[in-house]
Amino acid sequence: MIFMKEIVAIIRPEKLEEVKNALEAAGCHGMTVTEVRGRGRQLGITESYRGRDYRIDLLPKTKIEIVVNDEDVDTVVETIVKSAQTGDIGDGKIFISGVDEVVRIRTGESGKKAV
C-alpha cells in the first residue's frame, strides 16, 4: 500500500521565494527545485528585439518536487496554489503521484520515517 505521494509543481520562476516561504510556514521544509523550460496553453510568447520579433516557444519555469505522507498532500497542494497563483495563463500545474518507497541514504531508514 502506498502511503506517500510525490508532488511536482511547475510554477513561474518569480513565484519561487513566495512558494518556498509559504511551504516552510506550513511545515514543509524538504524540496528539490530545478530550473526548467516548458509550455502549456500559454504556447510561448513573442518578443521584439531591435525591431525584429522573436518567438520563444519554451518559457522558463521552476519545478518543485516534494515527497510527503498522504495526510499532508492537501495542505501542500493548497499552499502551492495560494502562493503561486496570479490568475493568468502560465501559472503552472501540479502533478501528484504515488511513491512506493523512500530510503534515507544517511541512516538507511525507509518508509514514513525517511520522509
Curated annotation (Swiss-Prot):
Record-linked InterPro entries: N-reg_PII (IPR002187), N-reg_PII-like_a/b (IPR011322), N-reg_PII/ATP_PRibTrfase_C (IPR015867), N-reg_PII_CS (IPR017918)
SUPFAM superfamilies in UniProt: GlnB-like
Pfam name, any one: P-II
Modified residues (O-UMP-tyrosine): 54
GO cellular component, one term: cytosol
Keywords attached to this entry: Nitrogen fixation, Nucleotide-binding, Phosphoprotein, Transcription, Transcription regulation
GO BP term (any one): nitrogen fixation
Superkingdom of the source species: Archaea
An MF annotation (GO) of this entry: enzyme regulator activity
Family: Belongs to the P(II) protein family.
Chain's role: Could be involved in the regulation of nitrogen fixation.
Protein's name according to its UniProt entry: Nitrogen regulatory protein P-II 2
